[in-house]
Regions:
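Positively charged n-region of N-terminal signal peptides that target proteins for export
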Residues: 1-4
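N-terminal signal peptide c-region/cleavage motif recognized by signal peptidases
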Residues: 14-17
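General helical structural elements
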Residues: 6-7, 619
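Beta-propeller folds
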Residues: 7-10, 20-492, 498-501, 507-513, ...
């Protein structure tokens, strides 16, 4: 009998040991953000278009170093801008520091006059820090100390036609216009703020301040006199009471008329918008309080007042734009051209002409949106286009064509995002695009050919509906044609100013990123393919795409599965669902990215990690799909996520349906906590980061838009707004699994109060859980992301694999990174 008991006890020990799977921290450690950064280089081209032609240049880095290319689309050529070996030798001879072709850091590389490059190179030579020393000496209130030193910066010009390198270090350096100056299109004057009012000065005085910021001869011409800290001129909405130095010149948001005679500006009344706070406990020398304006759902909002200034006499008048209580307005800005980037200052010009401009007006519940025209000779605005929906109206900036006589308007009025042609007077002329697909935006317009170029998803029903493609179509709605490659997602697109050519960066999560040049008819010239050779050499493998059904059994959902790179199909693995509920985007990406810490890298610990969409998630499908969660913002996506996991477990034997985890950040933090509380017998572990668990205290814009707010008009005619929503803390008593809550303590996006309220409810429900507060970190966790990763790895390893490194005080992987 004794012998039998010993045998049984030994068998139990063996069984317990077999049930635990050792987490593979070493494999995950190989793919830290820092290490991946040394294996993956350029993944997309950012074309820098020439000012006066369709040429462009770009930078491209691989494991062989960095090269710079000039592309001539007309001549169909791609040439290297520099002979890097020769350039490195010439720079070394001047700077007196050794460089080679693979190690030549060019700083501030810019094209000037389409004929030469300018750039800087930092040397190891220490020189006196002239500007700083001069300022300190000018103060005169401190004894002169040792001259401050800095590394010398050499400045160069490289002449394209001759390949000649010119050292211009000793030449007087061109100074940039100050950031506070909103300069008129004709370059004669600048508008800015001091304190809470608006001022202007001549451009000559601006230039004086560029030479000496204490020049006493400059004149500040004051335009307004009634600004206060909560009712101020020309700032951004919600800036509120953060201006402490009322003598300092600061930027304001004004938009000029094309002829520089007038400008429009909004004055924001923030007196009823309440403050919110965070305390930075690790600030030195003592903790600091940050106060900022933060409107929560149902609370009073800012009131926008639109003014038009006439620079001939400095007069202003208010434009009557009132239509809805707590409405939101935006004066539209002229679309920037590539050539504008070469100007000495960024031109802030309104969308319209010298006689008037256009703006958007939205009701607070976002069910009504107007495109307005404001004529400078009048005191009120005219409705051009009026949109209504029972959920909420979204818009895109219109494109004016035919000399401003017509406009291209984006609308979801028929359940899909489509393009419409309107007359400038508001007459609907025709629907341009027509079909069960989503038009994301207008990319370019060729007015001479009367062709619109746009990006759309879901046109080809045989493709993943999230794949974005470039199309062309005539103003009359005919001749629609796809221009880029099928089967990929064009996620970054740049057109030449004349709309004759475009560069597309395209990929999928399971393919290497590529870049190509196309002309307006779709003729393709390949440019680059990302160099992932070092990543693959380290063992990297692409994730696997999949398609499942939503819980309704009808709607298709799309996702990706991330496996350990040492995956063994004979084993079983826990599954972790990385989630973001939407509604502005879903957790699953459609383009390859090096930022895969919470998916690919997490899988290396020993998990199957998935991302999958859910009804109510992504806006790039139908309006029905996007608005599915309207009015049910806490729970709308949970059932689909659970059902997707169940389908995958039935499809793949290596998934252990009894070991399910869930993880998310921000909206995903909110969703992952809701999931483990709503389905406590299904989800066994969750890590929820920076979650907006209580959307009644999250920002009004996101919460009211995606959940809805009730607008009521009383018998006396007053308008009130009521907001009610289910919160995670309401169901804290349901917790059975293992929940880890994480927040930065100075998160001024999603207040830490969201997490604290869930913590409070869990404590009062007598629940065990984990809480991690990251000191001095905002919404994205900053330089503590790597620390967070290993704490997350510990949590899932402990509760899904059965063992972890939580018993080790030192995180060795962090010490070795």
């Amino acid at each position: 009998m004794k012998r039998l008991l010993i045998f049984c006890f030994a068998a139990l020990l063996c069984s317990a040991g077999a049930s635990a799977q050792e987490p593979n921290y070493a494999l995950a450690d190989q793919f830290s953000a820092k290490k991946v950064g040394n294996m993956v280089f350029s993944t997309a081209i950012r074309p820098n278009w020439f000012k006066n032609s369709d040429k462009f240049w770009y930078e491209w880095k691989t494991s062989e170093g960095t090269e710079y290319y000039i592309v001539d689309p007309v001549a169909k050529t791609q040439t290297k801008a520099f002979d890097m070996e020769r350039l490195a030798m010439e720079v070394s001879a001047i700077v007196k520091d050794p460089f080679d072709a693979k190690h030549l850091p060019l700083r501030k590389l810019e094209l000037k006059d389409d004929s030469k490059f300018t750039f800087e190179v930092q040397s190891t030579e220490m020189v006196e820090k002239k500007d700083k020393q001069k300022k300190d000496d000018d103060k005169g209130d401190k004894p002169k100390g040792k001259p401050q030193k800095e590394k010398k910066i050499y400045r160069f010009e490289y002449i394209l036609a001759t390949g000649k390198l010119v050292d211009v270090t000793e030449n007087e350096e061109e100074k940039d216009y100050p950031m506070w100056a909103c300069i008129s299109p004709d370059g004669s004057k600048a508008v800015y703020s001091k304190g809470f009012d608006i001022y202007w000065m001549t451009i000559d005085d601006v230039k004086k301040l560029m030479e000496d910021e204490k020049d006493s001869t400059v004149v500040d011409h004051r335009l307004t006199f009634d600004g206060t800290k909560d009712f101020y001129w020309g700032g951004s909405n919600y800036r509120g009471a953060d201006t402490k130095d009322t003598t300092k010149r600061t930027a304001n948001y004004v938009l000029w008329s094309p002829d520089s005679k007038r400008f429009a500006v909004t004055k924001y009344d923030m007196t009823k918008v309440k403050d919110l706070w965070v305390i930075n406990s690790v600030a030195q020398p003592r903790p600091t309080l940050q106060t900022y304006k933060y409107q929560m759902p149902g609370e009073p909002g800012p009131v926008d007042h639109l003014f038009l200034f006439d620079m001939a006499d400095g007069s202003c008048k208010e434009i009557n734009i009132a239509a809805y209580k707590d409405q939101d307005t935006d004066v539209l800005r002229r679309t920037m051209k590539n050539a504008d980037r070469y100007d000495d200052w960024r031109k802030s010009v309104w969308m319209g002409d010298n006689d008037g401009f256009y703006m958007i007006r939205r009701s607070r519940d976002l069910k009504r949106t107007d495109l307005l025209r404001v004529n400078v000779a009048e005191d009120s605005a005219h409705i051009v286009v009026h949109e209504t929906l029972n959920t909420y109206v979204e818009t895109r900036s219109p494109r004016f064509v035919n000399g401003g006589k017509d406009l291209i308007w984006w609308s979801e009025r028929n359940g899909w995002a489509q393009l419409y042609l309107y007359g400038a007077d508001g007459t609907l002329k025709r629907q341009i695009t027509d079909g069960a697909f989503h038009v994301e935006n207008v990319l370019a317009v060729d007015e001479a050919a009367k062709v619109i170029y746009f990006q759309a998803m879901g046109v080809d029903k045989n493709e993943n509906p999230y794949n974005g493609h470039v199309y062309r179509i005539g103003f009359d709605g005919t001749g629609i044609k796809q221009l880029d490659d099928p089967g990929f997602n064009s996620n970054s697109i740049s057109f030449s100013d004349d709309a004759k050519f475009f560069v597309s960066n395209f990929s999928r999560v399971d393919s290497t990123p590529q870049s190509a040049l196309y002309d307006g008819t779709g003729r393709k010239t390949p440019l680059q393919e990302a160099d992932l050779s070092l990543l693959f050499a380290a063992g990297y493998k692409f994730p696997t795409p999949f398609k499942v059904k939503a819980a309704d059994g009808v709607t298709d959902l799309y996702g990706y599965m991330y496996k350990p790179f040492d995956f063994d199909s004979t084993k079983t693995y826990p599954i972790i669902d990385y989630v973001y509920p939407g509604p502005q985007v879903e957790g699953n990406s459609e383009a390859w990215s090096r930022g895969f810490t919470r998916t690919d890298r997490l899988a290396q610990i020993g998990f199957i990690v998935i991302t999958v969409g859910n009804r109510g998630g992504h806006p790039n499908r139908s309006k029905w799909y996007h608005n599915f969660g309207y009015g049910n913002l806490r729970d709308y996506g949970l059932e689909d996520q659970k059902y997707a996991i169940q389908q995958l477990a039935a499809r793949y034997k290596f998934i252990d349906i009894d070991r399910v985890g869930i993880h998310g950040h921000s909206g995903g933090g909110f969703m992952s906590t809701a999931a483990i509380l709503e389905y406590p017998d299904f989800f066994k572990a969750a890590v929820s980061c920076a979650g907006n668990h209580d959307n009644s205290i999250y920002n009004r814009w996101w919460s009211e838009q995606h959940h809805g707010i009730l607008e009521e008009i009383t018998a006396s005619g007053d308008t009130t707004f009521k907001y009610s929503i289910d919160k995670n803390q309401d169901i804290a008593g349901n917790l059975k699994g293992h929940l880890m809550l994480v927040t930065g303590d100075i998160d001024d996006n999603v207040s830490p109060s969201n997490t604290i309220r869930v913590v409070n409810a869990l404590i009062r429900a007598n629940k065990r859980f984990e809480m991690l507060v990251l000191p001095g970190q905002r919404h994205g966790f900053g330089d503590m992301n790597e620390y967070f990763f290993w704490r997350m790895a510990d949590w899932y390893s402990e509760w899904l694999l059965g063992t972890s490194h939580r018993d080790q005080v030192d995180i060795r992987e962090l010490n070795n990174d």
